[in-house]
């Protein structure tokens, strides 16, 4: 299994658990919930691997450095 597939399966398992925990209730705003729960740890982890270098982290993420800085501010990630 490739790393992308592992991540895919982890997200899928988490969502299946989430639906099970909802016990038949209709969830809303799942897309935003997933992004909010994935985006911050993803950026923090990539920044760690980039040794705090925001330009390198942005390149690793495939986003513009200014976009990274904006997301860091929004998510209250210190840099």
Model segments located where?
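Bacterial C-terminal helix-turn-helix
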Residues: 2-6, 13-79
